């Protein structure tokens, strides 16, 4: 049997797209190659949000040159967001003639046809669709990893056009799946034994706007609440501008939607937020967080923060630090701005010097790490619901899972608890996780 290997860069959307690629390949008779096995086909699912990810892809393609020379029948494919960028597919063809297949984000369903062309002898098969205006394809197979959590894409694309972001150009405009299709998939996952679903989209808060029917993200969450077997519902990613008060209220009323709000703020300076085209002010963001906390005092709030956006001054950066102190995020994904060709920010004057970016990111990380540890320490003594996901290390006697705030909790327990929601009393706090003990009043036969 022929074997495949998929190498993934980037976000959860790419991870789930790779599950679809795997499903298609297995429907064609391929099986996944083990770590020590040589595959017959390698697909590299790429990301272009950061230059770092692109550099890693180029480095990998360079290393695969030797493997291709040793096995000329090996099929090497590049897919995902990178080839969707203007001129990138041709660049890959020229730099890496050993790449057999290049396709984008809109035509994954063509994979069998494209592989067939390679097998027939066509060189460097290229198929990039600049956009996709047709119906979403619901029939594609999915090969999910075993576990208790499953990703479910509810929409594709983004209409926001933040000035630094390449996503709308490579993922296209927003297009929502029907609520019926989402409901059916989640119900099927419940029947397969999954306990948690993570709803995916570049901006889930815009769900339904393009459907022409009276539905929105809050309504979708309310409908999924009724599916037996699913204990938890999460979602990503959200845009603060589109996060409605009704959505906050729906989450507060839900028993299954987790109280974790990931709301990328990006900057604390109104001047920079405007240049980024984020569509909200610092004050509006703070008001949203306050409303969330007023309804859900124990909510976990996390964020993304960028430093070094073009024109960012010391005063602008200090505004960001002040916001971090004010909100006290549970955690933050912090990163340095880098130029994405084709975006408005790439052409902006006053690009910030690299040494200044480095100083600022270090100061931000130091502050946020201090706050993150303090926020975790505040949870010591609490008894929390933890969905057990697996063993920490095989035979170690420790298992791990996530609480409703999406924080990892490590505690002593039997692997038979995987897939169950159990009460854990938090006894310790680290920067990246909590430690605890299984609550004394837990009875295995009563667990969910």
UniProtKB/Swiss-Prot annotation:
[4Fe-4S] cluster 2 binds at residues 158, 162, 165. One of its GO terms (molecular function) is metal ion binding. It catalyses: N(6)-dimethylallyladenosine(37) in tRNA + (sulfur carrier)-SH + AH2 + 2 S-adenosyl-L-methionine = 2-methylsulfanyl-N(6)-dimethylallyladenosine(37) in tRNA + (sulfur carrier)-H + 5'-deoxyadenosine + L-methionine + A + S-adenosyl-L-homocysteine + 2 H(+). Binds 2 [4Fe-4S] clusters. One cluster is coordinated with 3 cysteines and an exchangeable S-adenosyl-L-methionine. It comes from the Bacteria. Signal peptide: none annotated. [4Fe-4S] cluster 1 binds at residues 11, 47, 81. The keyword Isomerase does not apply. Keywords: 4Fe-4S, Cytoplasm, Iron, Iron-sulfur, Metal-binding, S-adenosyl-L-methionine, Transferase, tRNA processing. Its EC number is 2.8.4.3. One of its GO terms (cellular component) is cytosol. Residues 377-440 form the TRAM domain. Residues 144-374 form the Radical SAM core domain. Residues 2-120 form the MTTase N-terminal domain. It holds the Pfam family Radical_SAM. Disulfide bonds: none annotated. InterPro entries: Elp3/MiaA/NifB-like_rSAM (IPR006638), Methylthiotransferase (IPR005839), Methylthiotransferase_CS (IPR020612), Methylthiotransferase_N (IPR013848), Methylthiotransferase_N_sf (IPR038135), MiaB_methiolase (IPR006463), rSAM (IPR007197), rSAM_horseshoe (IPR023404). It is found in: Cytoplasm. The keyword tRNA processing applies. Its cofactor is [4Fe-4S] cluster. Monomer. Belongs to the methylthiotransferase family. MiaB subfamily. Catalyzes the methylthiolation of N6-(dimethylallyl)adenosine (i(6)A), leading to the formation of 2-methylthio-N6-(dimethylallyl)adenosine (ms(2)i(6)A) at position 37 in tRNAs that read codons beginning with uridine. This is tRNA-2-methylthio-N(6)-dimethylallyladenosine synthase. It comes from Pelotomaculum thermopropionicum (strain DSM 13744 / JCM 10971 / SI). The lineage of its organism: Bacteria, Bacillati, Bacillota, Clostridia, Eubacteriales.
């Amino acid at each position: 049997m022929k074997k495949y290997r998929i190498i993934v860069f980037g976000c959860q959307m790419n991870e789930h797209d790779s599950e679809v690629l795997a499903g298609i390949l297995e429907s064609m008779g391929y099986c996944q190659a083990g770590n020590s096995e040589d595959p017959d086909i390698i697909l590299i699912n790429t990301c272009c949000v950061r230059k770092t990810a692109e550099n890693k892809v180029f480095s990998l393609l360079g290393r695969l040159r030797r493997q291709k020379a040793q096995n000329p029948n090996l099929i090497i494919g590049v897919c995902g967001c990178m080839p969707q960028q203007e001129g990138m597919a041709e660049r890959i063809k020229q730099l890496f003639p050993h790449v057999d297949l290049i396709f984008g984000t809109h035509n994954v369903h063509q994979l069998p046809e494209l592989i067939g062309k390679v097998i027939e002898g066509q060189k460097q098969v290229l198929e990039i669709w600049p956009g996709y205006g047709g119906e979403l394809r619901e029939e594609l197979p999915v090969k999910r990893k075993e576990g208790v959590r499953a990703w479910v894409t509810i929409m594709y694309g983004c209409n926001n056009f933040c000035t630094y972001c390449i996503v709308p150009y490579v993922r296209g405009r927003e297009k929502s799946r029907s609520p019926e299709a989402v409901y059916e998939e989640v119900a099927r996952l419940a029947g397969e034994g999954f306990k948690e679903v993570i709803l995916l989209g570049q901006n889930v808060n815009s769900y339904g706007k393009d459907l022409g029917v009276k539905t929105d993200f809050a309504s979708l969450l309310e409908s999924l609440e009724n599916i037996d077997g699913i204990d938890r519902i999460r979602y990503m990613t959200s845009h603060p501008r589109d996060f409605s008060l009704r959505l906050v209220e729906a989450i507060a009323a839900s028993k299954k939607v987790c109280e974790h709000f990931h709301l990328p703020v990006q900057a604390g300076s109104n001047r920079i937020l405007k240049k980024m085209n984020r569509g909200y002010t610092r004050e509006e963001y703070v008001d949203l967080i306050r409303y969330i906390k007023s309804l859900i005092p124990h909510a976990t709030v996390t964020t993304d923060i960028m430093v070094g956006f073009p024109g960012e001054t010391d005063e602008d950066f200090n505004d960001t630090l002040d916001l971090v102190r004010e909100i006290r995020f549970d955690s933050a994904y912090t990163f340095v701005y880098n130029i994405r060709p084709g975006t408005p920010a790439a052409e902006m004057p006053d690009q910030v010097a690299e040494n200044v970016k480095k100083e600022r990111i270090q100061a931000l990380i130091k502050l946020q790490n201090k706050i993150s540890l303090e926020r975790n320490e505040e949870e010591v003594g609490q008894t929390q619901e933890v969905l057990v996901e697996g063993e920490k290390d095989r035979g170690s006697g420790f298992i791990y899972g996530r609480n409703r705030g999406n924080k990892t909790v490590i505690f002593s327990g039997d692997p038979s608890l995987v897939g169950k929601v159990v009460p854990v009393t938090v006894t310790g706090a680290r920067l990246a996780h909590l430690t605890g003990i299984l609550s004394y009043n837990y009875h295995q036969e009563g667990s969910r």
